[in-house]
Every structure is written in structure tokens, then in C-alpha cells.
């Protein structure tokens, strides 16, 4: 599994200028590595606010990444819809999918993995899935999927 320093290095290498986020128990482990990076992490209070901040950064010429957990993605739906479909902005989202590994193993009871997948499809967001715990997990390749033209989401298994 990639460590936080490898993840932050891959974010920088992918060309992101800012990480707009609400750290959760998984994504929050990146915080010490972010402190020493050229990324400018911006903590927000709500996930819809994260999308609004990212919109401002995009309009100002920056290349932000919004990182949030799946339940926060659900909360931010209208802001995502507005950014991607009304404003036609190349919004990039890293969505932590709580309970994804347990669901894959058939032991999970959390419905977040089920609805996260359905919601990115409902919003017509091109997306990829990534599980950092897999043996051949390549965080740089996973994050490279977010560098393609247009809006993109990466469903990050937790």
C-alpha cells in the first residue's frame, strides 16, 4: 500500500496545485506529508463548499483536486452537477469509498460503495476505481486517470 508521502508526491507529479478537502480517517493520514509539500491544502467545512472553492481555483487558473469521502460526495451532488454540467469545468474528484474492501469481500454492511458507484454514473462523471491495498497498486497511474481532459473522478477504496 502506498504511504502518504508517495501519495502526496504522486499528487504533485500529476500537476495538482491545491488539495481541497475534508480529511476523514483514511485521507487524513496524508496530512503530515501535505505539510511539507508544494500542494496547498485547503480544509473546508462542507463538501459542497469544497466544490465551490475548487470552482474558484479553476476559474483563477489553478488545478485543484477535491478529496472527500463518499458520503460527502452525496452531499455535494448539486455543486458537482453545476460545476461539471452547467459550467463545463474540468472538476477533479478523489472520492474515498468507505467500506469498499469489506463490500468486495462480501463482509460489509455499509451501502456507501453501492451508491458511490451509482452516483458517479448518474452524474455522468468519467471515473476509475483504485484500491491502494492491492498488491500491484500504482498510485501514480491511478492519479494519472484524473489528468485526462474534462471532469474526472477516482473512486479510492477504503
Region locations from a protein language model:
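Thiamine diphosphate
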Residues: 1-158
Amino acid at each position: 500500500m502506498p504511504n502518504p508521502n508517495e501519495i502526496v508526491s504522486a499528487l504533485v507529479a500529476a500537476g495538482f496545485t491545491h488539495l481541497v478537502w475534508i480529511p476523514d480517517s483514511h485521507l487524513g493520514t496524508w496530512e503530515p506529508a501535505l505539510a511539507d509539500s508544494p500542494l496547498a491544502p485547503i480544509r473546508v467545512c462542507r463538501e459542497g463548499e469544497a466544490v465551490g472553492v475548487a470552482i474558484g481555483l479553476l476559474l483563477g487558473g489553478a488545478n485543484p483536486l477535491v478529496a472527500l469521502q463518499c458520503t460527502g460526495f452525496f452531499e455535494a451532488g448539486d455543486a458537482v452537477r453545476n460545476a461539471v454540467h452547467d459550467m463545463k469545468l474540468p472538476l477533479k474528484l478523489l472520492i474515498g469509498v468507505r467500506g469498499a474492501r469489506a463490500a468486495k469481500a462480501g463482509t460489509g454492511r455499509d451501502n456507501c460503495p453501492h451508491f458511490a458507484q451509482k452516483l458517479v454514473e448518474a452524474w455522468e462523471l468519467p471515473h476509475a476505481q483504485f484500491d491502494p491495498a492491492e498488491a500491484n497498486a500504482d498510485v501514480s497511474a491511478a492519479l494519472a486517470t484524473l489528468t485526462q481532459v474534462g471532469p474526472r473522478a477516482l473512486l479510492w477504496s477504503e
